[in-house]
Amino acid sequence: MKQYLDLEKYVLENGTQKGDRTGTGTISTFGYQMRFDLQEGFPIMTTKRVPFKLVVSELLWFLHGDTNIRYLLQHNNNIWNEWAFERFVKSADYKGEDMTDFGLRAERDPAFKEVYQAEMEKFKTRILEDETFANKYGELGNIYGKQWREWKTSQGETIDQLADLIEMIKTNPNSRRLIVSAWNPEDIPNMALPPCHSLFQFYVADGKLSCQLYQRSADIFLGVPFNIASYALLTHLIAREVGLDVGEFIHTMGDAHLYNNHIEQVKEQLSRTPHALPKLVLSDKPATIFDFEVADISLDGYNPDPAIKAPISV
């Protein structure tokens, strides 16, 4: 997708070198927007393979209001493992090798990488096989799914923002309050990772549903391709439920950054030529957005270039 490649080029050429929480360092810019016409195809990277089924299972995990990585692991989805693992290795229950700064150390020390990978495999196995352990150490706090589906009020009640949003689109499509927020200041200290994609808004015009995402922190190489595909998929699912066509996905970013250890991968991606976008295929079986399963969602005509691996910063 040209819009995404333009973002990578812009940050490489105009970004500012900054330190960051992870210790990796970034090239960063503040304030950037991309627009995708969802009528022109499903916006997923074609200059590198994005594992679409992982996008699907993560979004369904959000839609279920789930915040435990066990569901993800049951669907062979490892994208949230490091944050749960970090909580575990910092606890008194962890008795293995020192895992301080495991992400950076695994990248730089092959011997430690083997130890880390072995500990991670043991952790994943325990999450899958031991429900008590999973309940304690698979939890990531009140992240996206919890805020979307069960926002706690000061009166002790809960708000299902997503269900309310869908109902409002049906009954008052011209509303300017078609918003879901994952940014709950009270819960931030207890989240494994505060919401990067923190707020989204829908807009109805000419029989089409459009979505704008505000993302406070955008990991351009690893995170943003998932975010684009995830919110495009969410727009399609909601449009199906409310009887509208899809319009645009508008992606607005605050701190948009390239990690310093992703620069060579970015240059490799920029050397590739985009291909035709695939088509999203949804099963007719699910009655509502909350009834979808991974097998109900697929892409037709997705023929990307090979994946480009890069380390994740935790």
From Swiss-Prot:
Which InterPro entries does the entry link to?
Answer: Thymidate_synth/dCMP_Mease (IPR045097), Thymidate_synth/dCMP_Mease_dom (IPR023451), Thymidate_synth/dCMP_Mease_sf (IPR036926), Thymidylate_synthase (IPR000398), Thymidylate_synthase_AS (IPR020940)
Q: What is the residue range of the signal peptide feature?
A: none
Q: Where does dUMP bind?
A: 21, 176-177, 216-219, 227, 257-259
Which residues take part in binding (6R)-5,10-methylene-5,6,7,8-tetrahydrofolate? Answer: 219, 313
Q: CDD domains under this entry?
A: TS_Pyrimidine_HMase (cd00351)
**Which of UniProt's keywords are assigned here?**
Cytoplasm, Methyltransferase, Nucleotide biosynthesis, Transferase
State its location(s): Cytoplasm
Q: What is its EC number?
A: 2.1.1.45
Q: Which residues form the active site?
A: 196
Substrates-to-products reaction catalysed:
dUMP + (6R)-5,10-methylene-5,6,7,8-tetrahydrofolate = 7,8-dihydrofolate + dTMP
Residue ranges crossing the lipid bilayer per the database entry: none
- Its annotated pathway? Pyrimidine metabolism; dTTP biosynthesis
Show the GO cellular component annotation of the record. Answer: cytosol
Q: Which GO terms describe its biological process?
A: dTMP biosynthetic process; dTTP biosynthetic process; methylation
> One MF term from GO for this chain?
thymidylate synthase activity
Q: Which domain of life is it from?
A: Bacteria
NCBIfam families given in the database record: PRK01827.1-2, thym_sym
PANTHER family cross-referenced by the UniProt entry: THYMIDYLATE SYNTHASE, THYMIDYLATE SYNTHASE 1
- Family under the similarity heading: Belongs to the thymidylate synthase family. Bacterial-type ThyA subfamily.
- What is this protein's function per UniProt? Catalyzes the reductive methylation of 2'-deoxyuridine-5'-monophosphate (dUMP) to 2'-deoxythymidine-5'-monophosphate (dTMP) while utilizing 5,10-methylenetetrahydrofolate (mTHF) as the methyl donor and reductant in the reaction, yielding dihydrofolate (DHF) as a by-product. This enzymatic reaction provides an intracellular de novo source of dTMP, an essential precursor for DNA biosynthesis.
Provide the assembly information: Homodimer.
The protein in question is named Thymidylate synthase
Q: Which organism is it from?
A: Listeria innocua serovar 6a (strain ATCC BAA-680 / CLIP 11262)
Q: Which gene encodes it?
A: thyA
